[in-house]
Regions:
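Membrane-interface extramembranous regions at the lipid-water interface
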Residues: 1-60, 139-160
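Short, amphipathic, aromatic/basic-enriched membrane-interface segments that mark the entry/exit
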Residues: 1-6, 98-105
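Hydrophobic alpha-helical transmembrane segments in multi-pass membrane proteins
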Residues: 14-31, 57-87, 111-137
């Protein structure tokens, strides 16, 4: 990218980064709209090609990190709200004759017990991912509109 970058390239690159906010209006808009803009213009403009890859790689990485945090939080969430879910005595053959005696109830005294600590930390991690996504997308939009090359941090290079 040693040649001069035209205003059209800068605007198109900034639009690719800003279009990731379309996820708030269109399901998977943060992938679809940047992908369409990038594929339509990647052969003509090297700067647009670079920024399209950056935006898509960052959005895929953010999705992967969010899924990972969500998967880690499932056992803590289920273990807290449904503490007897892993108690297999209720499903033993010896209890088959007493199916009317099974009582499912929630203990509200221990609703916010120590199991909430990991759930809260994972909730904070999910919030941090969301905030990082917004901040770095805004920074990328501004930097590319100024003609600077922007690299997202903590991005896995899925598209090279």
């Amino acid at each position: 990218m040693t040649e001069t970058i035209t205003k059209h390239e800068r605007n198109l690159s900034a639009l690719i980064h800003a279009s990731t906010f379309s996820k708030f209006f269109i399901p998977f808009g943060n992938f679809i709209i940047p992908l369409v803009l990038w594929t339509a213009n990647k052969k003509e403009y090297e700067f647009v090609d670079h920024n399209g890859k950056q935006a898509l790689n960052f959005q895929i990485s953010i999705l992967l990190y969010s899924i990972l945090v969500g998967m880690i939080s499932i056992p803590f969430f289920l273990g807290g709200f449904l503490p007897n879910i892993f108690d297999f005595d209720n499903f033993a053959l010896s209890n088959m004759h007493s199916f009317n005696n099974i009582n499912f109830s929630f203990d509200t005294d221990d609703l916010f017990g120590p199991w909430m600590i990991p759930v809260a930390l994972l909730g904070l991690a999910q919030s941090a991912i969301f905030i990082v996504n917004i901040i770095y997308t805004i920074l990328a939009t501004i930097k590319t509109n100024e003609g600077e090359v922007f690299e997202y941090p903590l991005t896995i290079k899925f598209i090279k």
